Amino acid sequence: MSVEVDGFNASPLFKELNDGLADKAKAQEAVKAVNAIIVITLKNKEGKEQSWVLDLKKDGTLAKVDGAAPKGDVQLILKDVDFVKLANNKVNGQKLFMNGKLKVKGNMMKATAIEAVFKKLDPRPKL
């Protein structure tokens, strides 16, 4: 199942994350490190909302959500462009939160794990 959604700059990042989770050893490592279900809800420049569920509690999977976002251990709500910056280490999650650009519902400590997950599962070559 595709995790990409037209109109969202973060779609390629979710594809990369999904590709990283395809490596079961990496997926289990992420599950062990995070142990949470993270719901990521993004809003694009047209105002459309889309959610993805990152299951790092059981099996290390990523799924696009059709309809309302389900409840997870933590939900991250932010703009598409800000998520791209966060995932690419261009901005700190704490800074986004303090500036009101990142809303967190649920377990705040689990929310801090998302940056580490992207670093660990990033399939791009390290230069």
From Swiss-Prot:
Induction: By alkanes or fatty acids; repressed by glucose. Pathway: Lipid metabolism; fatty acid metabolism. GO terms for biological process: fatty acid metabolic process. Signal peptide: none annotated. InterPro entries: SCP2_sterol-bd_dom, SCP2_sterol-bd_dom_sf. It is found in: Peroxisome. Residues 33-41 are annotated as: Hydrophobic. SUPFAM superfamilies: SCP-like. Residues 14-119 form the SCP2 domain. Keywords: Lipid-binding, Peroxisome. Residues 43-52 are annotated as: Hydrophilic. GO terms for molecular function: lipid binding. One of its GO terms (cellular component) is peroxisome. Its main location: other. The keyword Transmembrane helix does not apply. The keyword rRNA-binding does not apply. Is involved in beta-oxidation of long-chain fatty acids. Its exact function is unknown, but possesses a nonspecific lipid-transfer activity, despite the absence of a cysteine residue thought to be essential for the activity of its mammalian counterparts. Monomer. This is Oleate-induced peroxisomal protein POX18.
